[in-house]
């Protein structure tokens, strides 16, 4: 028998023996969470034989709190689990039967409360993939220090923010933004203004949900972005402070303080922030008026320099009262005051077909806006039993008040530079929005595994918008009844939902159904030249959701997922107001009372490898999509929201975290999206189809001795949506950080848009006998210096999430 034959028979013997041995063994797996149902990573799990307490194997939980023991002989065993700051856990006896894998029910560890102070440090990933959402941890990135919530969103995977503040997710518009599980009820520009005033230091996590579960409102074609603010429940007094100064063309500041005090049965928390954000937009708009043969009849060119001065004060105060181990009562007060002044100085020149100047208009548009917001939330939760049965209730009242004053001064000059006319348009536009909501949620674990959830919500919205315009010309003031109006809008939405979830051996399933009834009424009061007008609508819809995860291996190295959800996008309250609002002498914004809700079907396939790399293929079909439309009438361009038809969206995306070296971490997000918009806009058929690409690339380096740095890069190709085609852009950012004051403080310096390349622009299609394009330069290169400090006093357990500059290695430090 030659050597190769010996090897062959040896291989056969080992293979057969291995198969026989494997058939007589089994696997055991499970996962570990804390009392807040959060996964506990890096816990020690010891498997012991019951009869003699002999140690069999030791495992450490992964970042999702999971563990597994393979090839264990049948018999009686138990688990010992220990983790710093938690009580040691010993399981009941576990009987293992050969050829039958065992999944242990979820294990919950209790806080020990016996240590003076325990600091548990572990490296949080920038993005975490769950069955129904992607969770972003903003503190991981150095360049997120000292910036606004809107800028953090722009750097989140799959999120795009337009110049107007419209937010899209994976190439789809119609995203609804939530704060702490509550919708913001704001228009796009008001929401953008608020998010610019919200410091990144107040954000705990950002949840990206293309297909939110039935528990959430069905609003938002592209899903929900839920921003969770920081709230500490640790015993004693603790908090953090963040001070930031930024310098671009204009300066800006962003300061905040978070405080928490928990004693006995009370927990008090607060977030207070003050910031100033000054920037500019240098905007060029060119419009060509065409003859029937396509040749240019005239050209309008407008250069605008818009300076924005924003100031904001935000406050959030709350208290929880732990009536018993089962019952918690809470109240949260929040509000902001946001005065903004936008000064638009522009020069508009009209050229004839021979490109000779016909006339010039110099204009100054000063827009003073003051937004007040106040809200109060009362919440109640009751843990019915230790198995997880729970009921909770929330009552909310929210008020938004706006005081807007507009002053538009126009001076028209002839081609020889002589003054032809001069006029001033003044507008006073107060607005008031009252929102009342009440909801109840119930959760119950089922006897054979799984969880059943149900709930209902009722919301009432009342808005009042006033527009009072006057014209001043030749020292004579007259009321402008064409623009003046009074608009009231009332909306009532009632909803109920059911949701079921269950984990099987290799499959996790979640299914839900939400029903929403919408009843709305709008009334525009007349004036001397306009009649009263009104509209009413009532409709009821069902919104199913479904999620399926499949794990071929018990440890979850590969996870395949599928999800489906039906969504609705209702028009913004202000969008239904038919009044006209001048942006400049040639551009008018108008509402549209005939807007219908948008409905979409969203599908997603995902694959996640080792909880590090997620690949997703999403498809959505949207009907009656609402978007901004541009109509050309005479020399005026009207911007108004409209239902433009249908849109199909297909996106392939990959999101992953890598560690090429122990001191080097990479985070990569890339997507390719195919968009098709089929619409009839102002009598013209429009088929705007195209593919665009985008990527975010982040590199973090641990330099030792408390130093770390970051380099990030973002690129987006030309994008296609409805009437708009935007040009490509790219930008890069860098940051460096030094830990100080025994690692409780940090100094961070970052620079955004280092090469000053973020200069958006594009073309507007479907304008009939006109063509338009725009190009802008922004105050996007900003140097920001940030100081942050964490403090605590008293007996507590601190679970600290490692940020961009924390040591790369995991360590446990006990004091």
Give the positions of each predicted feature:
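Outer-membrane beta-barrel translocator/receptor signature
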Residues: 218-225, 233-284, 309-313
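Short, acidic, small-residue-rich periplasmic hinge/interaction motif at the N-terminus
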Residues: 33, 38, 44-48, 82-84, ...
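N-terminal periplasmic accessory domains that precede
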Residues: 105-107, 149-152, 191-195, 208, ...
């Amino acid at each position: 028998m030659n050597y190769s034959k010996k090897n062959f028979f040896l291989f056969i013997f080992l293979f057969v023996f291995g198969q026989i041995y494997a058939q007589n063994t089994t696997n055991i797996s499970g996962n570990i969470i804390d009392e807040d149902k959060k996964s506990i990573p890096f816990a020690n799990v010891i498997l012991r034989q019951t009869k003699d307490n002999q140690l069999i194997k030791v495992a450490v939980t992964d970042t999702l709190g999971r563990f597994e023991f393979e090839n264990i002989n049948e018999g009686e065993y138990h688990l010992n689990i220990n983790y710093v700051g938690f009580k040691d856990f010993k399981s009941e006896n576990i009987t293992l039967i050969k050829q039958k894998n065992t999944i242990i029910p979820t294990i919950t560890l209790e806080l020990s409360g016996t240590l003076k102070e325990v600091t548990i440090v572990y490296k949080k990933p920038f993005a975490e993939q769950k069955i129904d959402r992607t969770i972003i941890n903003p503190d991981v990135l150095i360049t997120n220090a000292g910036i606004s919530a809107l800028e953090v969103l722009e750097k989140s995977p799959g999120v795009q923010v337009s110049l107007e503040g419209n937010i899209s997710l994976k190439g789809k518009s119609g995203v609804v933004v939530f704060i702490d599980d509550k919708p913001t009820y704001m228009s796009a520009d008001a929401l953008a203004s608020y998010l610019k005033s919200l410091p990144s230091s107040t954000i705990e996590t950002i949840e990206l949900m293309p297909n939110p579960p039935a528990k959430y409102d069905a609003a938002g074609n592209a899903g929900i972005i839920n921003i969770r603010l920081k709230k500490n429940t640790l015993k004693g007094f603790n908090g953090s402070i963040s001070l930031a100064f930024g310098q671009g063309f204009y300066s800006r500041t962003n300061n905040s303080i978070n405080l928490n005090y928990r004693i006995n049965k009370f927990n008090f928390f607060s977030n207070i922030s003050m910031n100033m954000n000054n920037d500019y937009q240098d905007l060029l708009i060119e419009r060509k008026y065409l003859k029937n043969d396509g040749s240019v009849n005239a050209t309008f060119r407008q250069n605008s320099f818009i300076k924005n001065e924003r100031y904001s004060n935000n406050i959030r105060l709350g208290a929880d009262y732990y009536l018993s181990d089962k019952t918690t009562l809470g109240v949260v007060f929040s509000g902001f005051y946001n005065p903004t002044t936008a000064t638009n100085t522009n020069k508009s020149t009209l050229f004839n077909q021979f490109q000779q100047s016909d006339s010039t208009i110099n204009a100054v548009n000063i827009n003073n806006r003051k937004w007040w917001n106040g809200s109060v939330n009362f919440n109640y939760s009751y843990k019915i039993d230790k198995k997880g049965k729970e009921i909770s209730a929330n009552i909310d009242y929210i008020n938004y008040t706006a005081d807007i004053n507009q002053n538009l001064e126009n001076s028209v000059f002839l081609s020889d530079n002589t003054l032809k006319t001069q006029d001033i348009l003044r507008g006073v536009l107060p607005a008031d929005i009252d929102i009342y909501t009440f909801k109840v949620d119930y959760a119950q674990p089922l006897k054979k595994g799984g969880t059943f959830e149900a709930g209902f919500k009722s919301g009432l919205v009342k808005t009042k918008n006033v527009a009072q315009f006057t014209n001043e010309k030749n020292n004579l003031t007259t009321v402008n009844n064409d623009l003046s109006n009074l608009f009231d809008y009332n909306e009532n939405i009632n909803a109920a939902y059911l949701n079921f979830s269950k984990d099987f051996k290799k499959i996790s399933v979640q299914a839900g159904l939400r029903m929403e009834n919408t009843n709305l009424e709008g009334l525009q009061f007349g004036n001397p030249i306009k009649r009263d007008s009104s509209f009413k609508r009532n409709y009821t819809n069902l919104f199913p959701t479904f999620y399926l995860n499949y794990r071929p291996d018990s440890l979850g190295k590969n996870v395949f997922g599928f999800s489906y959800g039906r969504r609705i996008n209702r028009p913004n309250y202000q969008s239904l107001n038919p009044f006209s609002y001048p942006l400049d002498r040639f551009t008018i914004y108008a509402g549209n009372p005939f807007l219908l809700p948008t409905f979409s079907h969203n599908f997603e396939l995902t694959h996640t490898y080792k909880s590090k790399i997620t690949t997703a293929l999403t498809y959505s079909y949207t009907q009656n999509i609402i978007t901004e439309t541009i109509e050309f009438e005479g020399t005026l361009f009207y911007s108004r929201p409209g239902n433009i038809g249908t849109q199909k969206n297909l996106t392939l995306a990959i999101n992953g975290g890598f560690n090429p070296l122990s001191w080097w971490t990479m985070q990569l997000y890339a997507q390719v999206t195919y968009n098709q918009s089929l619409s009839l806009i102002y009598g013209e058929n429009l088929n705007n189809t195209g593919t665009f690409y985008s990527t975010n690339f982040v590199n973090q380096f641990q330099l030792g001795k408390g130093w770390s740095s970051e380099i990030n890069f973002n690129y987006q190709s030309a994008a296609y949506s409805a009437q708009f085609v935007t040009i490509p852009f790219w930008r890069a950012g860098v940051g460096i950080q030094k830990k100080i004051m025994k690692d409780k403080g940090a100094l961070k310096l970052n620079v955004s848009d280092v090469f000053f390349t973020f200069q958006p622009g594009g073309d507007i299609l479907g304008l009939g006998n006109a063509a338009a394009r725009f190009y802008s330069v922004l105050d996007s290169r900003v140097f920001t210096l940030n100081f942050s400090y964490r403090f605590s006093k008293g007996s507590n357990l601190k679970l600290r999430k490692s940020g961009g500059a924390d040591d790369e290695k995991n360590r446990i430090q006990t004091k």
